UniProtKB/Swiss-Prot annotation:
Produces ATP from ADP in the presence of a proton gradient across the membrane. The keyword Metal-binding does not apply. Gene3D superfamilies: F0F1 ATP synthase delta/epsilon subunit, N-terminal. The lineage of its organism: Bacteria, Bacillati, Actinomycetota, Actinomycetes, Propionibacteriales. This is ATP synthase epsilon chain. Keywords: ATP synthesis, Cell membrane, CF(1), Hydrogen ion transport, Ion transport, Membrane, Transport.
């Protein structure tokens, strides 16, 4: 049975990041990676920090770094990816993301050794995962430096 393309919206806290039609979406949930195709049953899951891949109807691949959130697919093929922070691969500075990752790793190690406030460690870990998702998104989009 032929199904119409998925209608996809990626929304962060401050903007609509991407909107369009897709024939395949690959995201990482807290349970593992999943692919969503037209005709997939309704679905709701918590996202892990990831590089979401959206294959458009014309065969292009949009790659978006997400810091977690939710992905929902309804019975009509409407997909919503809702996340606090999201960055399209073309907006990512790979060099900056790598510097952020390295700096956050160092800070995290220092805070863990000194047994700092768990909320500080949680915030640093969250920011580290976002930097890693940005690097992965840039890599998947074929962007090595910026």
């Amino acid at each position: 049975m032929d199904h119409p393309p998925l209608q996809v919206k990626v929304v962060s806290a401050d903007r609509e990041v991407w909107k369009g039609e897709s024939v395949n979406i690959i995201v990482r949930t807290t349970e593992g990676d999943i692919g969503l195709l037209p005709g997939h049953e309704a679905f709701l899951a918590a996202l892990a920090p990831c590089a979401a891949q959206i294959i458009t109807t014309d065969g292009n691949r949009e790659v978006i770094a997400c810091d977690g959130g939710f992905v929902a697919l309804d019975n009509d093929g409407q997909v919503s990816i809702i996340t606090q922070y999201a960055t399209r691969s073309e907006e990512i500075s790979v060099d900056q993301a790598r510097r952020d990752r390295d700096s956050l790793r160092k800070k995290l190690n220092e805070h863990e050794r000194s047994e700092q406030d768990p909320e500080v460690v949680q915030d640093l870990t969250h920011r580290l995962h976002l930097a890693q998702a940005q690097i992965a998104a840039a890599r998947l989009a074929g962007k090595q430096r910026s």
